[in-house]
Regions:
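Short, amphipathic alpha-helical "recognition" segments used to contact nucleic acids or chromatin
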Residues: 35, 141-149
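Active-site/catalytic core of tyrosine-dependent DNA strand-transfer enzymes
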Residues: 86-132, 137-138
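C-terminal secondary-structure termini that scaffold catalytic or DNA-interacting sites
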Residues: 186-218
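Active-site-proximal segment of tyrosine recombinases
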Residues: 48, 134, 144, 151-163
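Conserved tyrosine-mediated DNA breakage-rejoining catalytic core shared by Y-recombinases
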Residues: 50-93
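Basic, Lys/Arg- and aromatic-enriched nucleic-acid-binding interface segment
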Residues: 12-45
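Catalytic-site neighborhood detector that most strongly recognizes the C-terminal catalytic loop/helix
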Residues: 161-189
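DNA breakage-rejoining catalytic core of tyrosine-based enzymes
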Residues: 1-17, 72-87
Length: 218
């Protein structure tokens, strides 16, 4: 199994506009639907396989997700979450249009293994000389990284990613980092069935990172 930080680090080796380039290049309507969802919310591939509900309410685009990695006995994960996204992004515009075509509601599904395979193939096609390939999890790590670099509250990040605890987000990017992806996540609001548990470990980690950033800037 890959180290949890490996995908985060690999984002730095992808083309700066990799999300836009991949999305533009896809001709298959079914795959384009799936990649639009990944670009918009960074859901897990297993959640995409279950089906993502796309709806328009009061002219706002909402994606409903049934969570993966959920265990009611241990309190792990969020069973369901709703995410309001920026519909001015290329994938936001696309999903808004698709939902309107389907009388304001539709469900998008794609096989978890299949979508990553298609993305790796597309990555090789677009960037044959790059060793780092785009996968479904690249989108999830991008959303987490961008939200952190944008200074979004830990609770909002946890809700977006489907975490029960705000400490789980520590493998996605770093607050106060390079800021290269600041403002690019497109998440307006996230709502979950269960409240997010706050971890004191996150406070300690954020304090440590703040000191490190300050020291490195001296």
């Amino acid at each position: 199994m890959a180290h949890p930080n490996s995908k985060r680090l690999s984002l730095n080796r992808l083309a700066p506009d990799w999300r836009e380039a991949v999305f533009r290049s896809i001709k298959s309507p079914r795959l384009k639907d799936a990649v639009a969802v990944l670009s918009a919310v960074g859901c897990r591939p297993a959640e995409l396989e279950k089906g993502i509900a796309i709806s328009i309410r009061n002219n706002r685009l909402i994606l409903g997700i049934v969570g993966a990695k959920v265990n009611p006995e241990t309190g792990r994960g969020q069973p369901v979450r709703a995410i309001y996204i920026d519909q001015t992004t290329p994938w936001g515009e696309y999903l808004f249009s698709r939902a309107k075509e389907s009388t304001m509601e539709m469900t998008i599904r794609y096989d978890a293994g299949g979508v990553s395979q298609r993305l790796r193939e597309k990555s090789r096609e677009l960037w044959p000389r790059r060793k780092t390939l785009v996968s479904a999890y690249s989108y999830r790590h991008f959303i987490g990284k961008s939200m952190k670099e944008s200074g979004e509250p830990p609770e909002k990040i946890a809700m977006t990613l489907g975490h029960a605890s705000d400490f789980s987000q520590t493998v996605y990017g770093r607050a106060g980092g390079s800021k290269k992806t600041s403002g690019m996540h497109g998440i307006i609001l996230a709502v979950t069935k269960n409240p997010v548990r706050h971890s004191a470990k996150l406070d300690k980690l954020m304090k440590h990172n703040s000191r490190t950033t300050h020291h490195n800037s001296l």
